[in-house]
């Protein structure tokens, strides 16, 4: 296990990609919308991100679409290229200032991005960001609410330190190396995030959390694409600093995930996934990494049962149907635990834990080139993703799937318009959530996935939105100009609004501001 961790640590600042990867992981949802039409028209798989291709693709930022030469754009970027080696170093920025009726907020993020290739089999990527932020009130509360004294977590960006009066100082680094063994098998390892799905949210695995060490294997066999993902997570909610057998630090847990996708025809792609999360074992002489879950081709449920069912297993389906050239439907279904007889009885059995997503995208909506629309609905039953020990489906105090955890439904509308270097982006979210009582940790209503599900309010009559029924509305509007395509540097103005209403509180926050940022990452503050 120490060797396993050491390998991950050595490559924290590097990244790699195969013969040619569209750097989808370094595109925000906004920027990815600009290239999604090209990907769909090329019939390229976009479900498991970051994407891995086995052919040099014109979307790769290192290459010109006509002659595969390096893009001649040296604005704020440093390029170097030889026949079998090349790299680019680009600055990373996220500078913003916003105000509301009473206060002002700001973000100051600076960093560097390194990308390159060695031959035609190896590519690498790495970045580092240093940040100081003053957040709006609702987000400030989210950062401070971890139920661990003195521990503050910025969503998706890790642990923060106090900065001046009410600000936060935090840093983040990611990187990975990708090696193509042959045309059918690729190995990728490093420190980063993943996203499974074709929508704005994912109920399977999203880039909502802080980054983590991982090993990824991807196998392509005809119409099948098979991915194995092995990760290491930190549990900082249920287990504080553990000092056992000379080990001190946050408790760790591990995930093994299989995702098998089949391209049935040019229109239909269906994927089946299974994952298992298991806690670290501190018993003397016992390896923390359970070799039972390293077999790349087994099903985890039989193995879990053979071990006495101590771990947290999920299964599910991802579906994408191209209804026309520029339109497609997508859906996800996840099952945590499920009893058919209890479902038929319609008695609200607590262990019928599942979730589903239904979405629709129309690229070049109404034949307006550059106008993309996205409608999406998500629902997750209470207690889904949770467990009785630290094996909940989360990392660094953040859910691995949807930011709201469980016991919610959500409706999303997105409109994005791109014209040359200009863009307009609009997003509307409405979520209804059954919140847990933050003042009472002895009972769980199924929203907080880190609470022990044995603290449930009852075994039956568990309805949606059980707990503190809360309505949350988020609105976002951006007008931006793309300064540099190489690192997606843009300047823009924005408006944000968030409303929360329940029986205990009623809040409405609205603010507007300006920014200069490299729009490469997703920040899920709409929660």
Specify the residue positions occupied by each region the protein language model found.
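Exposed, low-structure sequence patches enriched in small/polar residues
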Residues: 170, 263, 268-527
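Short regulatory "switch" loops immediately downstream of catalytic or recognition motifs
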Residues: 1, 10-12, 233-236, 431-434
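Outer-membrane beta-barrel channel domains
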Residues: 22-269, 274-280, 345-354, 361-387, ...
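Bacterial Sec-dependent N-terminal signal peptides
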Residues: 1-24
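Short, charged, low-hydrophobicity "junction" segments
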Residues: 9-10, 61-67, 461-465
């Amino acid at each position: 296990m120490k060797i396993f961790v050491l390998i991950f640590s050595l490559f924290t600042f590097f990244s790699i990609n195969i013969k040619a990867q569209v750097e989808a992981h370094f595109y925000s949802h906004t920027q990815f919308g600009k290239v999604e039409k090209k990907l769909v028209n090329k019939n390229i798989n976009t479900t498991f991100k970051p994407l891995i291709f086995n052919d040099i693709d014109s979307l790769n930022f290192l290459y010109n679409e006509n002659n595969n030469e390096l893009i001649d754009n040296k604005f704020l970027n440093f390029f170097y290229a030889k026949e079998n080696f090349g790299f680019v170093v680009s600055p990373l920025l996220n500078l913003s200032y916003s105000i509301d009726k009473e206060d002002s907020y700001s973000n100051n993020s600076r960093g560097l991005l390194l990308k390159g290739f060695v031959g035609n089999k190896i590519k690498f990527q790495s970045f580092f960001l240093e940040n100081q932020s003053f957040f709006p009130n609702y987000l400030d509360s989210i950062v401070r609410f971890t139920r661990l004294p003195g521990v503050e977590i910025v969503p998706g960006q890790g642990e923060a330190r106090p900065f001046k009066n009410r600000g936060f100082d935090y840093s983040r680094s990611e990187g990975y190396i990708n090696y193509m063994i042959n045309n059918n098998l690729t190995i990728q390892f490093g420190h980063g995030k993943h996203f499974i799905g074709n929508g704005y949210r994912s109920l399977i695995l999203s880039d909502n959390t802080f980054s983590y060490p991982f090993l990824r294997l991807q196998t392509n066999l005809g119409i099948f694409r098979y991915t194995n993902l092995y990760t290491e997570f930190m549990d900082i909610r249920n287990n504080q600093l553990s000092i056992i057998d000379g080990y001190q630090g946050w408790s760790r847990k591990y995930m093994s995930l299989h995702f098998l996708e089949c391209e049935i025809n040019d229109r239909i792609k269906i994927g089946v996934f299974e994952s298992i999360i298991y806690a670290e074992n501190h018993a003397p002489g016992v390896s923390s990494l359970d070799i039972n879950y390293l077999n790349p081709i087994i099903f985890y449920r039989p193995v879990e049962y053979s071990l006495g069912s101590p771990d947290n297993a999920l299964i599910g389906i991802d579906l994408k149907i191209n209804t026309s050239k520029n339109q497609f439907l997508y859906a996800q279904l996840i099952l945590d635990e499920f009893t058919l007889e209890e479902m038929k009885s319609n008695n609200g059995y607590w262990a019928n834990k599942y979730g589903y997503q239904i979405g629709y995208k129309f690229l070049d909506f109404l034949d307006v080139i550059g106008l993309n629309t996205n409608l999406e609905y998500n629902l997750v039953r209470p207690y889904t993703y949770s467990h009785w020990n630290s094996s909940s489906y989360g990392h660094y105090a953040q859910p691995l799937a949807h930011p709201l955890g469980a016991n919610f439904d959500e409706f999303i509308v997105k409109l994005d318009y791109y014209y040359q270097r200009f863009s307009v982006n609009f997003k509307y979210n409405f979520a209804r959530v059954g919140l847990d009582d933050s003042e009472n940790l002895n009972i769980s209503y199924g929203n907080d996935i880190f609470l022990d599900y044995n603290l449930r309010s009852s075994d039956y009559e568990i309805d949606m939105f059980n707990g503190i029924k809360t309505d949350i509305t988020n609105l976002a509007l951006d007008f931006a100009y793309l300064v540099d395509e190489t690192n997606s540097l843009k300047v823009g103005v924005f408006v944000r609004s968030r409303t929360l209403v329940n029986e205990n509180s009623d809040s409405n926050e609205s603010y507007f501001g300006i920014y200069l940022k490299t729009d490469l990452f997703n920040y899920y503050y709409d929660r």
